[in-house]
Amino acid sequence: MSTLTSVSGFPRIGQNRELKKIIEGYWKGANDLAAVKATAAELRAKHWRLQQAAGIDLIASNDFSYYDQMLDTAILLNVIPQRYQRLAFDDQEDTLFAMARGYQGDKGDVTALPMKKWFTTNYHYLVPEVEPSAEIKLNSTKPFDEFNEAKSLGVETKPVFIGPYTFLKLARTPEAAELEIDKGLVNAVAAVYAEVLARFNDLGAAWVQLDEPYLVLDKEPGDVELFKALYTKILPAKGNVKVLLNTYFGHIADVYETVNLFGFDGIGLDLNEGREENLEAVAKYGVAAGTTIFAGVINGRNIWRNNYATSLGLVDALKQVTADVAVSTASSLLHVPFSTEGETGIPAEDLKHFAFAVQKLGELKEIAALTDATEDEKKSSAALAANQALFDGTRVAADPAVAERIGKLSDADYVRQPAREERQSLQREALGLPLLPTTTIGSFPQTKEIRAERAKLRKGEVTKEAYDEFIASQIDAVIRKQEEIGLDVLVHGEFERNDMVEYFGQNLNGFLFTKNAWVQSYGTRCVKPPIVWGDVSRANPITVEWSAYAQSKTDHVMKGMLTGPVTILNWSWPREDITHEEQTKQLALAIRDEVLDLEAAGIKIIQIDEAALREKLPLRKSDWHAKYLDWAIPAFRLVHSAVKPTTQIHTHMCYSEFNDIIRDIDAMDADVISFEASRGDLVVLDAIHDARFETEAGPGVYDIHSPRIPSEKEIEDRIYEILDKIDVKKVWINPDCGLKTRGNDETWPSLEHLVAAAKAVRARLDK
């Protein structure tokens, strides 16, 4: 029997971001919901047929979503808070969008659900909110409709779901006690999943995949019991359906024995990010009779070609224990671009080293064929020989100057003088800012006009001089507007930047860039990460010209805006031939040069965004420092350690949970940190208070990822919440992220309310 191939999930936005465009058109009133549904159906059909044509045996369905799979699961379970139900939309899709984005209109005014990073990826999920009054029941036919839709096209699929354990661990539940065994919530959720399996049994599904990535995290007391309680109630309902328990982003060595003996028909193991531990667990505990191990050998989170020899070795190690091995993607392919087809800007000799989602289907099929081949067939395999050739030679020459510079670093290069308390006093005197200074995070709306002008430059339809004049006019206008509404510290708007990572990559040695390699970040928001191809260094100043120009146009303090080394790496496709630590150190030196040039140009506040610092923190706490923080935090200090005491260093962090690493963040030795907090209900404030956080802080006072405009009173209330926990002298007032993706009609009223709220609070404090 041939080795089975399985894909955990496929990108849903479309090869040319068709889903993004049609949904955003719907939000703007340019097309109706029927057009959205039609485009979605076309994309699903295309993606299923692609996988079928590639020879994939177990093709995913229900991996499609208009916004987010966790949100879909909440709706499936009827976990819809009353505030959204009261909007009384006719279409469930509109309820979904209100939960994701908030809503402000004739039907009411509600904020969006909280949004967090999906484990260690740059994908964001909506956090389900289970109210005490929630009536858990099967509330959607989406999974069954899409299964039948595929079947009508002649494609047999494997429905995919977020598993109940992961859902409950990530959701906001009424109280921790609700997760005790035999409580109503656990039983109700299990009953819905049991009903889902029973329905798929009636529909004739061969396999159903339940994703339980939360199993790769450290276990808290009661976690294993919760898992057992759920699946004890769910699995008896499966009938003839085979259930694949799929895990990814790490290992499940600490629960493998339990999972193995539980009666699952398949267990999916990540052999990229949990390789050694997962293999050791299988070797130690074996594989239960009737259980197939799905070997996750295809990396679903990077774009480099798979090393077939390595993958075959992993499969062979499993086959020493069991003959029942399938080959699979290590995670959903949601996290990689669609296809390398059309990437003509990258030389063919370089492009051959990359595999996007479509190419990974081919890799999966070739690995399966090689798994079944005899040793003689492997020796004569053209596919194996061509693959091995990619790894035999030197892909790119090392830069000796970069290595030499790193070799000369000393401990002193990672320490800024004098101590922060002394710097704060000097900076307050030098900057002369009021109490509760107001600012923004950096970017302002990138209008159609701005994007069109950039496209013209790219196509050669305007000269660089004309483009620069246009950018200067945009900067002039945004400075005037910031001055008019009364912001204290200004920014130049970043109109010259297409993306906070790609822009820097384009001005550094060692990067490659794609034309269409988009991946979903959240909802319709897509990003196009650059590729770290070789050693990194700065060729020329990157931001100095525009920052200096902006400062020359105002008497206010102008922030210089940079992206930090950890974030550049985490939001790029990193190399796999050298460590992340080494790549980050190279980036840190390049950005350090930029910091010093900005300071020399008269920029008094320099913001070094580390939006993605928390994102790649290992999922198990025992790995946090040795495998990440011990080099990530020093890399940030290396960037700014040489500036003058009076130069104020800011940083910014995005959707992350900071509470557990708050002391490490303080150790970055920035002078000010702003961070997204509005969707997290400012829970980080307690951690800041308890840790006696020394860095000045700007917790975001409103959510920029929602189109709704916060009232002045709403922001005032937020400020008072902040002042309950943080010394007023250390508080900054700002939105929770950059404003690039918002419209001007939302941005300026929101900022006017922000400034008015800050002034009102100041006035009360002065009395």
UniProtKB/Swiss-Prot annotation:
Necessary cofactors: Zn(2+)
Active site: H705
CDD domains, per database record: CIMS_C_terminal_like, CIMS_N_terminal_like
Metabolic or biological pathway: Amino-acid biosynthesis; L-methionine biosynthesis via de novo pathway; L-methionine from L-homocysteine (MetE route): step 1/1
Pfam families in the cross-refs: Meth_synt_1, Meth_synt_2
Binding, Zn(2+): H652, C654, E676, C737
Biological processes annotated in GO: methionine biosynthetic process; methylation
Residue positions binding 5-methyltetrahydropteroyltri-L-glutamate: R17, E18, L19, K20, K117, R525, C526, W571, E615
Intrachain S-S bonds: none
One function term, GO molecular function aspect: 5-methyltetrahydropteroyltriglutamate-homocysteine S-methyltransferase activity
Matches recorded under InterPro entries: Cbl-indep_Met_Synth_N (IPR013215), Cobalamin-indep_Met_synthase (IPR006276), Met_Synth_C/arc (IPR002629), UROD/MetE-like_sf (IPR038071)
Domain of life: Bacteria
Entry keywords, A to Z: Amino-acid biosynthesis, Metal-binding, Methionine biosynthesis, Methyltransferase, Repeat, Transferase, Zinc
Entry's cofactor comment: Binds 1 zinc ion per subunit.
Binding site for L-homocysteine: I441, G442, S443, E494, D609
Function as written in the Swiss-Prot or TrEMBL entry: Catalyzes the transfer of a methyl group from 5-methyltetrahydrofolate to homocysteine resulting in methionine formation.
Family label: Belongs to the vitamin-B12 independent methionine synthase family.
The protein's name: 5-methyltetrahydropteroyltriglutamate--homocysteine methyltransferase
Source species of the chain: Bifidobacterium longum subsp. infantis (strain ATCC 15697 / DSM 20088 / JCM 1222 / NCTC 11817 / S12)
Gene name as annotated: metE
